[in-house]
UniProtKB/Swiss-Prot annotation:
Entry-linked InterPro entries: HEAT_Ints3_C (IPR056518), INTS3 (IPR045334), INTS3_N (IPR019333)
Protein name: Integrator complex subunit 3
Gene Ontology CC annotation, any one: site of double-strand break
Modified residues annotated as Phosphoserine in this record: S502, S537, S995
Record organism: Homo sapiens (Human)
Length: 1043
């Protein structure tokens, strides 16, 4: 299992005849297929592989038989011709790296030289291969892919963290200890361990790595090889948890669940002792285990432990398979992923994923699609291990234990109650065991927090009734099918829910005709599939994909996707004869080209002078029915090229858009087509983002994005902002890839609508994954995208404080990609509470430590109220002490003098506009005293600097006795300075030896500022404080006053 590391690719190739290295025991001798992907003689050639091989041949033809310098010149000259040529060369070199290990080092060097986009093309292609093609990738290519990622990380390429997270997603859990899977787990771990300093720069990567390897530790036991890997994983996780606990805190309550599974490992046993008894040892901002348990885990973490293939199959079942027809799919899933004894632990990951990530739209809920509770019921009934069954039940109820209606979603707790409700008739034992577990988990989960758990479960049940998931719980809790002891326990624990005699009325339409959970179809249904074998496909694409939030790679059974004939008869009689004939032609048209011709004739007829505009509504109804498939299919092509984009906008419906682009805006025909689109929009709101896509993708619409504004004004909404936000929301719900594709042009073309609030930003960060985040960051840094501007960035970041943890981190990453001075958003500090806003505080703290402190920054930091658990101000002041002691001393001196010289009456009568930024003398002294205590056992001599001592003297001379008493230790430093200043000049010269300059080379203790990330602040609304431009007083003037 020895892997290629660093420059080992070329060396390994030379030693083994370009075999490419281990790959978990696999070699280059693949059993058939192309250079990249495994395939059989029956498989069609993969489009992606064809394209990459084409690009590789272009590079090879330019570099074969010439010197290295000539090859470099040829590549650079070709790249300079345009973006398509740049992409071809980058992908060609990338493919050579994967397929020719002997040339890997040279090709990587060439790639670094010719890349004009910070390797963005290569990073995107790696992500695509990992998500879609990894299972079919040749072993040599897998090995080289790991080598390439290691090189990208070593080079510090922006976005490599996203690729590492995608790689981690490919590591299968659930007891998969096959050679290839273990090789991958160890390879990624080696990269993260070797490049530790790079890992520590990304909070998201730290959290994702800890979550991934904490989960994998449980599976790695038995052989000496697995034990060795397990120890490396333990050391890795423990080091990050102990050194960067605040970053790991973003995982939320599922971190506790994973830590419980490894609690008996000695290193984690010690960690648990600190979490329970000494939380401050992990981070000054960590108040205890309750803080973790009350934090909801983002869906990004829950999704990361399912491989892309597993996730695709599960999403397919929850969005396409009809209830009653799921048995074949479940049998396949069982054989593929749940057939071994060790794989039982995977059920927890699946249940957490279904509860926390799969949140069906109302359209799916109201259909006959397989509901979530049925899949969970199947996972519970087929579980063969008692330990796995207990863990699966805990996974199902986990969000109940500390449920808060303000922070948690009803969708996370809904499956558990519906499993119990629907199982009562066919499987009363399942309902009984779940109800029993719900009662017993309250006192047993963690006895010191029993009250909180009881409140969480009670809040969950209350919320379920309030939202009418079930109208009453009494028929469930007091059902005669339950034994008397269980019913008595339920009455004792939950008397509030046992009183109603009414039967339960389920409002959510998740209940199908049959409630039986053994998932057997009737004979009649079964006969439909006698000749059809259900099969998941790893490599084929579902061309009829409805694409709800995900891109699926699966062919369903043919019978399930047959479209029912469209019935437009009710509308035809209301149309003129000639128009009716054309609509019927359109319905009968078999190919796109013919339909486009008919569609153009319909548009021409609409534009005729004698056309009756009252028929527009009827025509719109016909078109909406006829083109339903357009709105269900994929909009954005998989491979984005000029040709594929132009082909994608060749749909008949888009003829209306094309005609619109060719007209003058003051033309009556233009208004008529807008009216037709407005009628269509009323009947099918998705038309809005289809128009946006057309204006973005079509060459005919170049520079015509302003047409969307005319369209928005023509709709019943009549408002550009409202219309744009509704259309982007519809796009977000249907197709995240398209949302990301549209984002740069939407922000560029409609800056006033997008940049003035965080509405669109929130839509984006709520659904993107780490790869898409990295892509957006690259767009920002390349100047293609501006998501923040100075006049509104502060308000948007304040709005983001109410978002989910991962969404906030995404927002901050995107902000930091912009070149906006930190001082613009420093007033956000006044809104940040140390318990409620750890995400923003962590990001702000890490960014402040990179800045030279300005007086305004220091003022804002010192303006925060003092609290014993709030270490934010002390953390950043300590860091600035170490790096910029003289500058910080001058700023603090200036602020002390200003606040001391202001009359008390004036301070209290400040206008409300500056109330948030108000800084009091007592606040400054309290923070300085905390800093003094923090520096007590260090060799840092910050408080012996002349400006600080002069300012303290100045304050001491005029403050009252209460303050002198309260800050006596702080003022005693000034008294010592005063004593030394009255001595002869010779003594003064000696004292000068301890001046800041002479202390510059003093040994400084290691900093702990990176662990600080929480603080407190005022709840009042923000108003920007005006920057002060007063001249700073010279130290000599203040010194002479004191003397």
């Amino acid at each position: 299992m020895e892997l290629q590391k660093g420059k080992g690719a070329a060396a390994a190739a030379a030693a083994s005849g370009a075999a490419g290295g281990g790959g978990g025991g696999a070699g280059a001798g693949a059993p058939g297929g192309g250079r990249l992907l495994l395939s059989t003689s029956l498989d069609a050639k993969d489009e992606l592989e064809e394209r990459l091989e084409r690009c590789m041949s272009i590079v090879t033809s330019m570099t074969a038989g010439v010197s290295e310098r000539e090859a470099n010149d040829a590549l650079n000259a070709y790249v300079c011709k345009g973006l398509p040529q740049h992409e071809e060369i980058c992908l060609g070199l990338f493919t050579l790296i994967l397929t020719e290990p002997a040339q890997a080092q040279k090709c990587y060097r060439d790639l670094a030289l010719v890349s004009r986009d910070g390797m963005n093309i290569v990073l995107n292609k790696i992500n695509q291969i990992l998500m879609e093609k990894y299972l079919k990738l040749q072993d040599t290519c897998r090995t080289q892919l790991v080598w390439l990622v290691r090189e990208l990380v070593k080079s510090g390429v922006l976005g490599a963290d996203g690729v590492c997270m995608t790689f981690m997603k490919q590591i299968a859990g659930g007891g998969d200890v096959t050679a290839k899977n273990i090789w991958l787990a160890e390879s990624v771990l080696d990269i993260l361990t070797e490049q530790r300093e790079w890992v520590l720069k990304s909070s998201i990567l730290i959290a994702m790595a800890v979550y991934t390897y904490l989960r994998l530790i449980v599976d790695h036991h038995g052989t000496a090889q697995l034990q060795a890997l397990r120890q490396k994983e333990v050391d890795f996780c423990i080091s990050l948890l102990r050194e960067r606990f605040m970053e790991c805190l973003m995982i939320g309550r599922d971190l506790v669940r994973l830590l419980q599974n490894v609690a008996r490992i000695p290193e984690f046993e010690l960690l648990w002792k600190d979490i329970i008894h000494n939380p401050q040892a992990l981070s000054p901002q960590f108040t205890g285990i309750l803080q973790l348990l009350q934090s909801r885990t983002s869906r990004k973490f829950l999704a990361c432990r399912l491989t892309p293939d597993m996730e695709t199959k599960l999403l397919f079942m929850t969005s396409r398979v009809r209830f009653g027809q799921q048995k074949r799919y479940q049998d396949w899933f069982q054989r593929q992923y749940l057939s071994t004894p060790d794989s039982q632990s995977l059920r927890c990951d699946l249940i957490r994923y279904i509860c926390g990530v799969v949140h069906p739209s109302n359209e799916v809920l109201s259909s006959d699609i397989l509901p979530r509770w049925a899949i969970i019921g199947w996972l519970l009934t087929t579980c063969t291990s008692n330990v796995a069954a207990s863990n699966a039940k805990l996974a199902l109820f986990y969000d109940w234990l500390f449920f808060s209606p303000d922070k948690d979603s009803i969708m996370n707790i809904e499956p558990a109650i519906l499993v119990m409700h629907h199982s009562m008739k066919p499987h009363p034992a399942i309902t009984a065991t779940l109800l029993d577990f719900m009662c017993r988990i309250i006192p047993n989960f963690y006895p010191p927090l029993e009250g909180h758990v009881r409140q969480g479960v009670f809040s969950s049940l209350n919320h379920i009734v309030e939202k009418r998931v079930l109208a009453h719980l009494a028929p469930l809790f007091d059902n005669p099918k339950l034994d008397k002891e269980l019913r008595a326990m339920l009455r004792e624990k939950f008397p509030e829910f046992c009183s109603s005699p009414s039967p339960p009325v389920e409002v959510k339409i998740e209940e199908p005709v049959s409630m039986e959970m053994d998932n057997h179809m009737s004979d009649k249904d079964e006969s439909c599939y006698d000749n059809a074998e259900a099969a998941f496909s790893d490599d084929e694409e579902d061309l009829n994909s409805k694409g709800k939030k995900r891109e699926f790679r699966f062919h369903p059974i043919k019978e399930t996707v047959v479209e029912e004939p469209v019935d437009i008869t009710p509308y035809l009689d209301q149309l003129d004869e000639s128009l009716r004939d054309k609509v019927l032609q359109l319905q009968k048209g078999s190919d796109t080209e013919a339909q486009c011709e008919v569609m153009q004739e319909i548009v021409d007829q609409v534009l005729e002078e004698d056309f009756d505009s009252e028929q527009l509504s009827v025509l719109a109804s016909c078109l909406q029915e006829l083109f339903k498939a357009h709105f269900r299919g994929e909009v954005l092509p998989e491979e984005i090229t000029e040709e594929s984009l132009e082909e994608s906008v060749g749909k008949p419906l888009y003829l209306i858009f094309r005609n619109l682009c060719q007209m003058q805006e003051d033309n009556s025909s233009f208004s008529l087509l807008l009216d037709l689109l407005s009628e269509l929009y009323q009947k099918q709101p998705k038309i809005g983002y289809h128009l946006l896509y057309y204006l973005r993708a079509s060459k005919a619409a170049a520079g015509k994005m302003n047409l969307y504004e005319s369209f928005a004004q023509a709709t019943q909404l009549g408002d550009l902002h409202t219309c744009l936000m509704m259309d982007m929301k519809a796009c977000q719900e249907d197709d995240v890839r398209l949302l990301c594709h549209l984002t740069p042009s939407i922000y560029t073309e409609f800056p006033d609508e997008t940049l003035r609030s965080g509405e669109l930003l929130n839509m984006i960060v709520a659904v993107i994954d780490s790869a898409q985040l990295q892509e957006l960051v690259c767009h920002v840094m390349m100047g293609n995208l501006v998501m923040f501007r100075k006049d509104s960035v502060l308000n948007i970041l304040i709005q983001s404080l109410d978002w989910e943890t991962f969404e906030q981190y995404c927002a901050w990453q995107l902000f930091l990609a912009h070149n906006i001075p930190l001082e613009t958003i420093i007033p956000i500090l006044q809104h940040l509470k140390y318990k409620e806003h750890p995400e923003a505080l962590s990001c702000l703290l890490l960014q402040l430590r990179r800045e030279k402190p300005s007086e305004e920054m220091v003022k804002m930091v010192l303006s925060r109220p003092c609290h014993p658990d709030d270490q934010f101000t002390t953390s950043i002041l300590r860091h600035w002490c170490m790096k910029h002691d003289e500058l910080l001393a001058e700023h603090i001196k200036s602020l002390l003098i200003k606040n001391n010289s202001l009359p008390r009456k004036r301070q209290s009568l400040r206008s409300s506009s500056s109330k948030l930024a108000q800084l009091t003398l007592e606040q400054i002294l309290e923070h300085l005293d905390n800093l003094r205590l923090n520096l007590t056992n260090t060799k840092q001599n910050f408080f012996s600097q002349t400006p600080i001592l002069q300012a303290l003297q100045h304050v001491q001379a005029s403050c009252d006795e209460a303050h002198k008493m309260k800050f006596s230790d702080l003022f005693s430093l000034a008294e010592e300075y005063e004593d030394s200043s009255t001595k002869p000049p010779k003594s003064r010269r000696k004292a000068a030896l301890s001046s800041p300059r002479s202390r510059k080379n003093a040994t400084q203790p290691p900093n702990a500022e990176e662990e600080s990330g929480s603080s407190s602040a005022s709840e009042e609304e923000d108003t920007k404080p005006k920057p002060t431009k007063r001249k700073r007083k010279g130290s000599s003037a203040v010194g002479s006053d004191s003397d």
